[in-house]
Regions:
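Intrinsically disordered, low-complexity Ser/Thr/Pro/Gly-rich regulatory segments
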Residues: 1-116
Length: 116
């Protein structure tokens, strides 16, 4: 876990969210997991569900696009099945990539980018 993930985890926990971090999802038959979701948090009071994927990498945008697409798709597929199965599957999931820079981009894998 990076220091960025730790700060995000602490922030959402402090705000009263139920937070899961570094959660492996999609157990594979031959062993291992399909993906790991970095931060998934739910606030009972306002019913806000958020999936955050922080990254401080220096990969190309095409590589990042591929990686974030896989993580966000896995989030939509598994959050209601494996992480918070007691939530209604029709609830909206806010998905955000947290990066150190974004250039002129506003989205990655169709989701919002926030820079630190």
């Amino acid at each position: 876990m990076s220091h960025l993930e730790e700060l995000i985890y602490q922030y959402y926990e402090w705000k009263g969210y139920v937070v899961r971090r570094n959660t492996k999802v999609g157990r594979l038959r031959h062993g291992g997991w399909e993906c790991e979701l970095d931060i998934v948090a739910f606030n009972h009071q306002d019913r806000h569900l958020i999936h955050l994927e922080p990254s401080i990498d220096a990969h190309s945008w095409s590589k990042r696009e591929e990686r974030f697409k896989k993580k966000f798709e896995a989030g939509r597929k598994y959050i209601f099945k494996e992480i918070f199965p007691w939530l209604s599957s029709d609830m909206e999931i806010e998905q955000i990539a947290i990066l150190i820079s974004k250039g002129t981009r506003e989205l990655i894998a169709g989701r919002k980018i926030i820079i630190i």
